């Protein structure tokens, strides 16, 4: 397996209330398929406000049959961020398609994939997501809860040719990042203990070698190896179900969602500084 690298291919407090999303089929006990056809992913488009104040559109899709959720958003600089939650495999996948700067010798765009363990309390179930509706699609949404920054040290490469063993979504989502798919040792260990073949994973470097490498922002020679940092944010996603009480019902019932924003910072090895030109020293 080649070292991961680039594959060339052509805050203020959030306002309340947030999104009045009708969970109509879910709340009213409608049969499966009412509001979203069985077997076809249900899509929700939401206008969201980014941390810098700019507005973009998110597309959220849920496939209750595959038990997965996907989110796509385009940043103002043109970067496309995609997120997949695969509940069946306990896997979440982040992909960034970063537009290149031709004047710096970069290709049209660069793709990165980060794969980590999914905890089921991070996001609402796919069946609930598939039944979300919104009353005012033109409204600009802002997350009710800002969750803390998560910093992740990605020290394992994922073998793209074997990636389907980890998640069936990986080979499609990370097709442009075949040599730049990263995960963590602790997550790889969790998946191998659950039966994923160890051939899916390969250490990037020995721990001592990574400690000795400088941050890419401190390296002037674009041909030198270094530790790259990449940050991304999920600006708005349904992280929890809300429950309401009623005199007419003996038990609490689902009546909406709570939305969250969460940021991630990944650090990982690159064989050349040229593959991490966005990472500049402050």
Swiss-Prot record:
<protein>
    <recommendedName>
        <fullName>Out at first protein homolog</fullName>
    </recommendedName>
</protein>
<comment type="similarity">
    <text>Belongs to the OAF family.</text>
</comment>
<keyword id="KW-0732">Signal</keyword>
<dbReference type="InterPro" id="IPR026315">
    <property type="entry name" value="Oaf"/>
</dbReference>
<dbReference type="Pfam" id="PF14941">
    <property type="entry name" value="OAF_N"/>
</dbReference>
<dbReference type="InterPro" id="IPR053894">
    <property type="entry name" value="OAF_N"/>
</dbReference>
<feature type="signal peptide">
    <location>
        <begin position="1"/>
        <end position="29"/>
    </location>
</feature>
<dbReference type="Pfam" id="PF22873">
    <property type="entry name" value="OAF_C"/>
</dbReference>
<dbReference type="InterPro" id="IPR053897">
    <property type="entry name" value="Oaf_C"/>
</dbReference>
């Amino acid at each position: 397996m080649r070292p991961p690298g680039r594959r060339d291919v052509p805050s203020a407090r959030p306002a309340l209330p947030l999104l009045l999303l009708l969970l109509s089929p879910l709340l009213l006990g409608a049969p499966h398929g009412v509001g979203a056809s069985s077997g076809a992913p249900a899509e929700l488009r939401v206008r969201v406000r980014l941390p810098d104040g700019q507005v973009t559109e998110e597309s959220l899709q849920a496939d209750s049959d595959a038990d997965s959720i996907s989110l796509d958003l385009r940043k103002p600089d043109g970067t496309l961020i995609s997120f997949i939650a695969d509940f069946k495999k306990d896997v979440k996948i982040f992909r960034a398609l970063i537009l290149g700067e031709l004047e710096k010798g970069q290709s049209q765009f660069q793709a990165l994939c980060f794969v980590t363990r999914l905890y089921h309390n991070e996001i609402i179930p796919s069946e609930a997501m598939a039944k979300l509706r919104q009353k005012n699609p033109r409204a600009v949404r802002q997350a009710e809860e800002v969750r803390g920054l998560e910093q992740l040290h990605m020290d394992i490469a994922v073998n793209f040719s074997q990636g389907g063993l980890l998640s069936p979504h990986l080979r499609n989502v990370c097709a442009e990042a075949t040599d730049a798919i990263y995960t963590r040792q602790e997550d790889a260990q969790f998946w191998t203990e659950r039966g994923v073949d160890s051939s899916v994973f390969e250490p990037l470097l020995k721990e001592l070698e990574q400690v000795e490498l400088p941050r890419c922002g401190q390296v002037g020679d674009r041909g030198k190896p270094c530790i790259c940092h990449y940050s991304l944010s999920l600006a708005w996603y349904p992280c929890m179900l809300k429950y309401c009480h009623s005199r007419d019902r003996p038990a609490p019932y689902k009546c909406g969602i709570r939305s969250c924003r969460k940021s991630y910072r990944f650090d990982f090895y690159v064989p050349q500084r040229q593959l991490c030109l966005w990472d500049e020293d402050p």
